[in-house]
Amino acid sequence: MKQTWRWYGPNDPVTLSDVRQAGATGVVTALHHIPNGEIWSIDEIQKRKAIVEEAGLEWSVVESVPIHEDIKTHTGQYDLWIKNYQQTLSNLAQCGIYTVCYNFMPVLDWTRTDLEYVLPDGSKALRFDQIEFAAFELHILKRPGAEADYTAEEIAQAERRFATMSEEDKARLTRNIIAGLPGAEEGYTLDQFRQHLATYKDIDKAKLREHFAYFLKAIIPVADEVGVRMAVHPDDPPRPILGLPRIVSTIEDMQWMVETVNSMANGFTMCTGSYGVRADNDLVDMIKQFGPRIYFTHLRSTLREENPKTFHEAAHLHGDVDMYEVVKAIVEEEHRRKAEGSDDLIPMRPDHGHQMLDDLKKKTNPGYSAIGRLKGLAEVRGVELAIQRAFFSK
């Protein structure tokens, strides 16, 4: 695997020098300062690429080129935004950047309820609490029809939880859910959030798939022509939330994508922490079935709690993800490619490290502190080395 590291640009508290010292050789970044839908010019791409290369690193993957909400709802200027997206892909290819991670999650990107969940060892992790999320939906957002998405027991627990919350607790929960997490290009006030949710009132899973298919049929041929590989990121969490459909959550969704546009430019990001939240997702089977189309991987683990819809981010080698078997399947795919004459390594980044040690005293991007990811990268690197030596050394 090619070892990479997500970097949020010049304002990231983790520097490129830190990235290089961590042992990564590739950088995963994006032009976050450019508004959603606007073209990434060659000049802007080259400026960022030069910064990365001056640090002795390579810009390996774009994460992400965001998809404008008009495209997801198939309203407004969606065709203009698609044309801009096509041009951005062409510009990236002209600059020698050929792997693009993206997602098709409506309104919100990845979602958590607690950004400072304290683990028994004193480090902090990200957590999604199903009951707190229900309390937000039912008693703060007050989304019409939200009761239908929860069991009677969850509704009762949410009411009890809400009754114990201070105003500060309510504000923090609201902020965590709607203000935008790292990598998300959108942040909302509560009223703006309600308005954006309303734009999806007539969009179910089938309709959102129609809109995604329209996007894929417009984008993938351009990506194919210029040599860019599109790697869709799964929904996080991988199930419907807030009354919104989710359409990249299961192996069936992956198969639908391939059948919709059967081009090798139409590929996947294997995010084990997103897919792995669902107990019915067999990560190794996903890799084996769609290995040739996996162009990027995020390696992390989550741990489901008593309510299986509640989870927190575990250490990289613990939790519900069998990281050994996942890494072994990825390495096997790389060796399959090598046997066919390709030296195409899969870029991997350690995803969402715990906030720990000295980082507990620093201001960090949630999930993206340095030391936790350094630990995760070192652990995964060791797993890969052991697999390479045990199964593939001559």
Curated annotation (Swiss-Prot):
Named cofactor requirement(s): Fe(2+); Mn(2+)
Domain of life, per lineage: Bacteria
GO MF term list: ferrous iron binding; manganese ion binding; mannonate dehydratase activity
Entry keyword set: Iron, Lyase, Manganese
Manganese in keyword set: yes
EC number: 4.2.1.8
GO biological process, one term: D-glucuronate catabolic process
InterPro entries given in the database record: Man_deHydtase, Xyl_isomerase-like_sf
Catalytic reactions on record: D-mannonate = 2-dehydro-3-deoxy-D-gluconate + H2O
Pathway connected to this protein: Carbohydrate metabolism; pentose and glucuronate interconversion
Enzyme class: lyase
Described function: Catalyzes the dehydration of D-mannonate.
Family: Belongs to the mannonate dehydratase family.
NCBIfam families: PRK03906.1, uxuA
Protein name from the UniProt record: Mannonate dehydratase
